[in-house]
Amino acid sequence: MSDICDANKLKYRFRGYFPVVIDVETAGFNSQTDALLEIAVTLLKMDNEGVIGIDKTLHFHIEPFEGANLEPEALAFNGIDPTNPLRGAVSEKEAFLEIFKAVKKAQKASDCHRSIIVAHNAAFDHGFVSKAIERCDLKRSPFHPFATFDTATLAGLAIGHTVLAKACIMAGIPFDNKEAHSALYDTERTAELFCHIVNRWKSLGGWPLLAVDEQDAQSGTEA
């Protein structure tokens, strides 16, 4: 970590974790019983200066799993009609196989050893993702089983607001409320917000940290 070039590599920024921004739209709040209806996944990249940004986004409309509960209030809120054939929905398994493939490829390219979900109010998205993976009996998930980066918490600290739309606007990121509650739109705004916070922290001198030996040397000089 004493080498500034190493500190500008993604694999060193988050302890070997590759951040993957996710947003889901669902038919309720219960990941055990309610349908996952839409998911978007934004992959990130870091340039040679250590600035993190958006790489690409995957987006899937999802068929409700067999026996899934569909709460009318949730459908009215997100405007999704699960029966609409124009959605082009795929099964949970098909979507997650594609997501796993893309995430693992990007994770490997960044020389990271595991991926970590980034989301706004991350416990919600992480819960639905984890339950879908379990239902599909998919092995070797790239995602950490419980750790996440929650942009609601990060925004509360860095910007002073926890609502996604308000935090984005305060950070100078355009946000159209008419587009909100689309997994694709919300994921990319969440990704922009996460990148803004990480890059802002770096620009203020919060990263990279001094290595222990550098700190010791500096303390010795000052003494």
Curated annotation (Swiss-Prot):
Keywords: Exonuclease, Hydrolase, Magnesium, Metal-binding, Nuclease, tRNA processing. The record marks 29, 77, 124, 146 as: Important for substrate binding and specificity. The keyword Nuclease applies. GO terms for molecular function: 3'-5' exonuclease activity; magnesium ion binding; nucleic acid binding; RNA exonuclease activity, producing 5'-phosphomonoesters. One of its GO terms (biological process) is tRNA processing. It is an enzyme of class 3 (hydrolase). Pfam families: RNase_T. Its EC number is 3.1.13.-. The keyword Methyltransferase does not apply. CDD domains: RNaseT. Trims short 3' overhangs of a variety of RNA species, leaving a one or two nucleotide 3' overhang. Responsible for the end-turnover of tRNA: specifically removes the terminal AMP residue from uncharged tRNA (tRNA-C-C-A). Also appears to be involved in tRNA biosynthesis. This is Ribonuclease T. It comes from Shewanella baltica (strain OS185). The gene is rnt.
